[in-house]
């Protein structure tokens, strides 16, 4: 099957391309001109350049495709205006649905986010029916994206299925997404802070498999949470410390101290022109529980691995990149789980490379 993936060089997109190739798809990878293509290096996917905000380029890329995965997005809490986020999310999705219609594709799988299901002040688990209650620009853009996508798909008779990943961790994240940055930030934090609240951690490899299942079995008009374990932040940080042989959390920051620290980080970032370790938008999430059930996706055959495996995958890959500097790397003592994860990642890449050379 010929399949189009937008945002193919991103964290989710690059892992999705690999999953599709393994399952015999003829993949067309849609990326912007001058994109960083390291995450697609050596793969047999056809690279097509364009922009989701340019309908003709997207329609041309979709020509001859039976299935479209729309993973293109701006996932950032820094240096993007609310209008920028919403424009790419909403208009880009409308254009993707219209491109599928023009190409005669039967289905679009939209990469949404679990944040469209809101969060809770207490440790309770939400699901696909939970109401949206977030106020940050990124979350608002994702909720608007879903609404616009489902509406346009209904008008054109396109089968649209939305998948809502939790906090994705893993490999091929060269631009460093906010999710993997959480791990790096803890390692770089000299005070080893943790904070109240929690989130749902999931391996991006499992999220990629969940996309494939949604494309095969998902019900049109439905959304599916692609998550794994729900954990509190102190437990997550202790797990990172254990996996990488560093200090466990030394104290718990509250909402106010987190917000002030993030404001200081943003000021430093504006002077150094380097992304901050945290932002005020992220600090507002302190104390909230982003916990979700993936029971509906389980009906499709979705079986994610534990959060520890997701963290081990991410740690193994990040240690091989400049995201973790040499000095910091030398201070760490990775566990056997991290080394084992690296061996698996290497074996998977070698298998893909062998397939490409066959």
Name each region found by the language model:
Residues 3-25:
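N-terminal Rossmann NAD(P)H-binding glycine-rich loop of SDR-like oxidoreductase domains
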Residues 34-91, 99:
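NAD(P)H-binding glycine-rich loop region in Rossmannoid oxidoreductase-like domains
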Residues 70, 74, 82-138:
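Conserved Rossmann-fold NAD(P)-dependent oxidoreductase catalytic core, especially the SDR/UDP-sugar
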Residues 131, 181-202, 206, 210:
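A conserved pocket-lining segment of Rossmann-fold NAD(P)-dependent short-chain dehydrogenase/reductase
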Residues 135-137, 166-175, 192-205:
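Glycine-rich "substrate-gating" loop/helix at the edge of Rossmann-like oxidoreductase active sites
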Residues 135-161:
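Active-site Tyr-X1-5-Lys
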Residues 156-158, 170-181, 214-224, 246-248:
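Glycine/proline-rich active-site loop of Rossmann-fold NAD(P)-dependent oxidoreductases
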Residues 210-280, 299, 307-358:
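Mid/C-terminal beta-alpha module of Rossmann-like enzyme folds, strongest
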């Amino acid at each position: 099957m010929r399949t189009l993936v937008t945002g193919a060089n991103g964290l989710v997109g690059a892992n999705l391309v690999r999953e599709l190739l393994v399952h015999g798809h003829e993949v067309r990878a849609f990326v912007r001109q001058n994109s960083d293509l390291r995450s697609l290096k050596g793969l047999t996917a056809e690279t097509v350049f364009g922009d989701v905000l340019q309908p003709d380029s997207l329609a041309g890329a979709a020509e001859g495709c039976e299935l479209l995965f729309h993973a293109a997005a701006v996932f950032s809490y820094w240096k993007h205006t609310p209008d920028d986020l919403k424009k790419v999310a909403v208009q880009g999705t409308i254009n993707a649905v219209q491109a599928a219609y023009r190409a005669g594709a039967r289905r679009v799988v939209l990469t949404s986010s679990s944040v469209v299901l809101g969060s809770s002040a207490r440790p309770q688990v939400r699901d696909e029916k939970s109401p949206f209650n977030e106020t940050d620009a990124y979350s608002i853009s994702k909720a608007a994206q879903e609404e616009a996508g489902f509406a346009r798909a209904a008008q054109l008779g396109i089968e649209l299925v939305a998948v809502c990943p939790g906090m994705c961790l893993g490999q091929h994240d060269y631009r460093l997404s906010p999710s993997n940055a959480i791990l790096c930030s803890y390692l770089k934090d000299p005070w080893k802070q943790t904070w109240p609240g929690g989130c749902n951690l999931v391996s991006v490899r499992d999220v990629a498999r969940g996309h494939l299942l949604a494309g095969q079995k998902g019900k049109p008009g439905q959304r599916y949470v692609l998550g794994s374990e729900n954990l509190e932040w102190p437990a997550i940080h202790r797990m990172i410390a254990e996996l990488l042989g560093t200090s466990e959390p030394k104290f718990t920051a509250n909402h106010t101290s987190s917000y002030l620290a993030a404001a200081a980080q943003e000021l430093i970032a504006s002077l150094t022109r380097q992304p901050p370790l945290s932002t005020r938008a992220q600090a507002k999430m302190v104390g909230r529980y982003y916990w979700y059930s993936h029971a509906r996706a389980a009906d499709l055959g979705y079986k994610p691995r534990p959060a520890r495996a997701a963290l081990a995958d991410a740690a193994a890959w990040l240690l091989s990149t400049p995201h973790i500097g040499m000095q910091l790397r030398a201070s760490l003592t990775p566990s056997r789980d991290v080394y084992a994860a690296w061996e698996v990642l290497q074996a998977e890449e070698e298998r893909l490379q062998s397939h490409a050379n066959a």
